[in-house]
Amino acid sequence: MKVSRRSFLMGMGAAGAPFILPTGLRAAEANGRLNIGFIGMGTQARGLMGNFLHQDVNVVAICDVDTTRREAGCRRVDQFYTEHPEKGKPGNCKGYKDFREVIARKDIDLVCVATPDHWHAYQTVEALKSGKHVYCEKPLTYSIAEAKLVMEASKKYGRIVQTGAMQRSGIEFWTACMLVRNGAIGKIKLVQAHFGGPAKLHFDPNPPQEMEPGLDWDMWCGPGPLVPYDPVLSPRGVHDGFPNWREDDFFASGGVGDWGAHHMDIGQWGLGMDESGPVKVIPATWKSNDAKRGFRATNGAKLVYADGAVMEHGGGSTWGTVFFGTEGIVCVNRGRIAMWHGKEGVPDRTTCQQIQNGSFDGMERVCFFNNEKKFMARQSEIFGNLPEMNGSNEQACAIAARRFNLSQAATQLYRVRGGGHPADFVKCAKDGSQPCSRAEVGARTSIICQLVNTSYIHGNAGFEWDPVKNEFGAGGDNKWLMRRIDGINAGYRNGFFPQV
């Protein structure tokens, strides 16, 4: 069974030394319910709202450039508060077409930004400047320059940012990174992060489509170019799918910015690189035959860190992130975890195939839970009943935690308990501590996503990177690469480039 984003948000169950920032909340707000406004009301935002409605907040504003979505969001809030009067009062949620009206409201404490990627940075920075704490969907930014500005803005205005890298709220990811950070598999040589390839070039758009009334398409395009309306990019109204703007260079970064922002984020966490990053990018050694992607490679780029560890963009696996160490292997994905211990994990073809079922000569299988019933049934036919399999993700995590005494480990990572990512954000907005996916964490993950993306965009380019200054070294062209969109069109439209 695959774990959806929505169920993951609702179900994941805060220890660790917190980072503290002044919140600026009024005393009554700090002790009571906070007011939150939503910017964007697409599929992901609706999943988030389902969680936030159960938190200690009042949903008072819904903004979307699509009238149907906006009105549906307000109706949902009113219906929820009608059915749950202890949670809030119906009739208090107002709809907006322009997000600037939401962040201008003095009575709103928090905003949730769940718009297409090209809008994230500007809306986040403007909300921070107006005194709001921000929950922003991943990737936190569309470009490297934007990532630097979001970090700067969060510090300057003393407000909290929680990036929607919700895997950090999952017990399996926390356990995997605790094992890795505390040396359970020795020195890390390689991290494989498995996700899709870069976006498509926007040189082959669909024929212009007639647009039904009720959508401000100019505002949807925002900082990006004003392309003809395309329902493939943004279907009208309420729907359950994820639109194809994720696959368009003008508005996103394909799988690199989408799932790379999850699985490489876990790689950064496991490597202890939340406040740093790689020093070099090694390009992929092949190119695709896909003209719509500009013949770009879809995986294979490598990030090299100062200690010699490498994070590689893998081509696909049951596991989202795989750590290969000198004394073992740790694999993790949503709702699943596995660990082998005893000798060096060698990422050859045989090993990469075997981690799907998990049998290695000379290695102890510490825990193994795959959570794919059909997959495991097929493996059982081939390999037998696999009695070492654990009964659940939680059981597998507990076995590994006991085996390596993680409760007493020297390095203790921030752990979210109950309510998941949104609850962590609300708690931190109230008490002034920093959440698990704070601004710098999300920004640095966005940066490595764009380093990988940049390598593909430039025909498998390799270059050096300074993770202290966040600047390109040898092989990099700062102006084009840092702002990115300037190389695609004339620049950010309508002044929508973040200004701190």
Residue ranges of model-derived segments:
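N-terminal glycine-/serine-/threonine-rich beta1-alpha1-beta2 phosphate-ribose binding loop
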Residues: 1-133, 145-160
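C-terminal helix-rich "cap/oligomerization" subdomain common to oxidoreductases
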Residues: 10-30, 294, 374-414, 427-500
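A contiguous active-site-proximal alpha/beta segment in oxidoreductase catalytic domains
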Residues: 133-135, 141-219
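Active-site rim elements
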Residues: 163-165, 207, 246-257, 285-290, ...
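Core domains of carbohydrate- and sulfate-ester-processing enzymes
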Residues: 192-239, 343, 350-353, 359-379, ...
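Rossmann-like dinucleotide-binding domain that binds NAD(P)(H)
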Residues: 217-308
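Active-site-adjacent bridging/hinge elements
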Residues: 229-244, 393-400, 418-426
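NAD(P)-dinucleotide binding in Rossmann-like oxidoreductases
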Residues: 299, 304-416
